[in-house]
């Protein structure tokens, strides 16, 4: 009995001791370990690197922490014997084994080496890989391009392979200006009445990335024979509050500021961007013409023109995304944009004889004021049925744009004039997309899109007579234009081992109404078209693949090209639309190749496009002459610019991009595009055949310097080009920028110099049977901009996997 009681007592004491031991362990005084972790190559601190400590006696009790923005860590632990691991995604980990730590200890400084294999699987937020390749598009991330800081969207476009921007800001893709520009995957009021001109008002800092789609799938609208450029705006998805404030100042006179705010909880994400810009832009050019007078000597007219433009605008975007549950979300957003612009154009016109003697001289001053406003409301409902991409997305978008333009025109030899243009546009967009991944390697989708727009143009000219302005009814008109497009699409894609394909078909029904109120001309056009798409890909390895794409596209005439009422820009020249203009259709084949080596990446493609009923602008004589001088008598043929359909255009080209990265401190990339364009067709017994070989190239270098400095230099050359009646010369542009991190990397100072050589001139020669014209034009002179950026709660080193969906409304095709 005593032995039993003794045994029970020992067991009880033992259990009590072991039961109390953890509590006693917890009461032991903690100590600290500290140190610093940096990148071995750049010496930059690694924020959010992890430090984990495993006690040999208690392996399930893991202690640890993370580094701060300076790469420092300071962690409280219990004394003991530990295996310590220091890790950062994309770098080789460091392990310290069997370290006995009994007191506060400084572990020291650790320099982690890059792990090239794991780095290929992740990417830095704000510093992602410059180019991503998808089955049907290329994605260019903007974050690292410091030469566009303080600039606009057009400056970003001017540095993207295959994209070029002319001196007037017009955007073309592979030399074709019929490119469709989308914002977050949808048409936008930012690309409304003013076209690409409105993009100059959107700051470069608001852009997350740009998608270049040369072989669009069936989900995309069929407009744009060159392809699609999709601009994705920034929207932070990180939990908590973060903000970015940007201030710009430059020469010529330029002041600007941007505030981007984002607040995210588990269920709600609120985001906003506010921008203000006040910019002065100087430009000008010369326009020299020779008019043929049959057997008589030619007459000449030389114009010298100077522009002084001031643009003041603000842009406010506000939105909220509410997560009803883990698989259902509702997003509501909207923006307003207001722009007040003035432009003074001073023109001196000299009429000369064949000997070069000035016969008469006219001074012309045109003072123009423009108010351009737009607003947009968007509501998006997304229902995810699972985590594999099975979803239903419904979206509605309402847009409204107005543009009021008034000009006072005074001539030294004729009465003054006033011209006013009132334009308004409404556009409603409805879209429904359903995506069903049948299994991990197979996907089916279909959808509907309704695009309904109406536009009213009121153009009025008044001429001063006896001190009063009298409306000239021969030059004033009102045009109503409506365009309604209903579309259905479906596509099916699959991946079989290393082979992927995406097959699609899109149907679009178009109804256009042209109502010229002044002349009571009414015309209605209806047509239905089918647009097949094919995208194929074969992956030899993770470093090498090929793609093949086919798409059929359409180019619909714009309202101004259909308006039959003449619009005069001078006494001898006017523009007139063609209401019989038909849409143009194109079929494009695109073959792509991608190869990655350790330090070199090659991305190339070859393409062929055949377009029919090509919309072409021509200048022709009206058969009338205009007397521009009485003493001596000088008569000049009256000319008209209009648009016509020619038979066809064939475009064959190739492009490639090489990126060389010998180290993380230096990157060199180059892009080259060359194409042959052949236009065939006749109009009014006149042959408009033309063929040209043109090319453009760009080179870009990025250097990381010590103490937080970075530098970038880029050059762009656009080769000669030609149309049915004109030829343009090539030009070269050199720009550069430097960048310095300040305030513990919370702030950045950037200095950007654009067109360092003052060489961006557009030189063009137009030749017809009646005249030849040479023009040399500069849209804007060199500019220099200083930008300061300050960020609050930015987690720039946090990483995410490649291929994560950004919710941009685009068409990511992945299996």
Indicate where each model-derived feature is located.
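Transmembrane beta-barrel wall of Gram-negative outer-membrane proteins
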Residues: 253-281, 297-345, 373-375, 534
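Short acidic/polar hinge/loop motifs at secondary-structure boundaries
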Residues: 76, 153, 159, 186-214
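Outer membrane beta-barrel strand-and-loop segments of large Gram-negative receptors
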Residues: 418, 427-431, 472-477, 482, ...
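Short, acidic, small-residue-rich periplasmic hinge/interaction motif at the N-terminus
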Residues: 25, 38, 50-54, 87-89, ...
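N-terminal periplasmic accessory domains that precede
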Residues: 108-111, 153-154, 195-198, 212, ...
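Short, acidic Ser/Thr/Gly-rich low-complexity loop/linker segments typical of extracellular
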Residues: 56-72
């Amino acid at each position: 009995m005593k032995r039993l009681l003794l045994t029970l007592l020992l067991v009880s004491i033992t259990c009590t001791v072991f039961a109390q031991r953890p509590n006693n362990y917890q009461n032991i005084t903690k100590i600290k370990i500290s140190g610093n972790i940096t990148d071995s190559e750049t010496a930059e601190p690694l924020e959010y690197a992890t430090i984990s400590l495993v006690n040999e006696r208690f392996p399930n009790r893991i202690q640890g922490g993370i580094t701060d923005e300076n790469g420092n860590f300071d962690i409280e632990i219990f004394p003991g014997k530990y295996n310590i691991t220091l890790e950062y995604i994309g770098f080789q980990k460091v392990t310290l084994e069997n370290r006995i730590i009994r007191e506060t200890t400084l572990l020291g400084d650790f320099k982690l080496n890059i792990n090239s294999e794991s780095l290929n699987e992740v990417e830095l937020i704000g510093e992602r890989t410059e180019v991503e390749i998808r089955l049907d598009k290329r994605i260019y991330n903007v974050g690292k391009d410091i030469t566009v800081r303080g600039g606009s969207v057009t400056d970003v476009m001017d540095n993207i392979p295959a994209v070029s921007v002319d001196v007037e800001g017009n955007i073309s893709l592979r030399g074709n200006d019929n490119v469709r520009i989308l914002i977050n995957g949808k048409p936008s009021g930012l690309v409304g009445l003013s076209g690409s001109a409105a993009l100059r008002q959107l700051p470069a800092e608001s852009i997350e990335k740009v998608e270049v789609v040369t072989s669009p799938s069936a989900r995309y609208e069929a407009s744009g024979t060159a392809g699609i450029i999709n601009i994705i705006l920034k929207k932070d998805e990180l939990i908590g509050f973060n903000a970015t404030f940007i201030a710009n100042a430059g020469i010529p006179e330029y002041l600007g500021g941007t505030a981007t705010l984002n607040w995210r909880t588990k269920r709600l994400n609120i985001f906003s961007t506010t921008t203000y810009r006040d910019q002065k832009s100087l430009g000008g050019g010369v326009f020299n013409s020779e008019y043929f007078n049959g057997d008589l000597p030619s007459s000449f007219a030389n114009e010298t023109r100077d522009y002084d433009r001031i643009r003041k605008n603000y842009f406010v975007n506000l939105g909220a995304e509410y997560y009803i549950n883990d698989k259902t979300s509702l997003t509501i957003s909207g923006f307003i944009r207001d722009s007040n612009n003035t432009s003074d154009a001073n023109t001196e016109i000299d009429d000369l004889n064949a000997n070069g003697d000035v016969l008469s001289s006219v001074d012309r001053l045109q003072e123009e004021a423009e108010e351009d406003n737009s607003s947009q409301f968007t509501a998006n409902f997304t229902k995810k049925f699972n985590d594999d991409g099975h979803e239903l997305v419904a979206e509605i978008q309402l847009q409204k744009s107005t543009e009021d333009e008034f000009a006072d025109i005074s001539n030294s030899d004729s009465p003054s004039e006033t011209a006013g243009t009132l334009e308004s546009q409404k556009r409603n967009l409805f879209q429904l997309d359903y995506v069903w991944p049948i299994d991990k390697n197979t996907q089916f989708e279909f959808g509907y899109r309704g695009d309904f727009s109406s536009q009213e143009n009121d153009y009025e000219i008044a001429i001063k007579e006896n001190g009063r302005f009298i409306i000239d009814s021969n030059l004033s008109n009102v045009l109503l234009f409506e365009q309604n497009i209903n579309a259905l699409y479906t596509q099916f894609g699959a991946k079989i081992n290393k082979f992927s394909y995406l097959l699609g078909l899109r149907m679009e029904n178009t109804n256009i109404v042209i109502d010229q109120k002044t002349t009571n001309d009414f015309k209605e056009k209806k047509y239905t078209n089918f647009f097949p798409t094919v995208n194929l890909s074969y992956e030899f390895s993770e470093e090498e693949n090929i793609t093949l794409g086919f798409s059929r596209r359409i180019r619909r005439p714009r309202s101004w090209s259909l308006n039959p009422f003449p619009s005069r820009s001078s006494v001898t020249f006017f523009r007139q639309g063609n209401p019989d203009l038909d849409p143009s259709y194109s079929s494009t084949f695109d073959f792509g190749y991608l190869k990655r080596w350790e330090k070199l990446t090659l991305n190339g493609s070859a393409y062929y496009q055949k377009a029919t009923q090509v919309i072409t602008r021509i200048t022709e004589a009206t058969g009338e002459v205009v007397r521009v001088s009485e003493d001596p008598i000088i008569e000049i043929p009256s000319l008209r610019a209009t648009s016509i359909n020619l038979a066809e255009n064939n475009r064959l080209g190739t492009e490639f991009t090489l990126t060389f990265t010998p180290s993380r401190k230096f990157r060199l990339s180059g892009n080259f595009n060359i194409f042959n364009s052949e236009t065939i067709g006749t109009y009014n017994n006149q042959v408009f055949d033309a063929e040209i070989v043109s090319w453009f190239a760009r080179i870009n270098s990025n250097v990381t310097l010590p103490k937080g400095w970075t530098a970038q230099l880029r050059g762009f050359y656009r080769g000669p080009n030609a149309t049915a009646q004109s030829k343009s010369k090539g030009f070269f542009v050199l720009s550069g920028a430097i960048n310095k991190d300040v305030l513990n990397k919370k702030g950045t100072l950037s200095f950007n110099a654009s067109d360092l050589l003052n060489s961006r001139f557009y030189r063009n020669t137009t030749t017809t049977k009646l005249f030849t014209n040479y023009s040399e034009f500069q849209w804007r002179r060199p500019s220099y901009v200083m930008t300061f950026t300050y960020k609050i709660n930015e987690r720039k080193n946090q990483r995410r996997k490649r291929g994560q969906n950004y919710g941009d409304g685009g068409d990511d095709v992945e299996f």
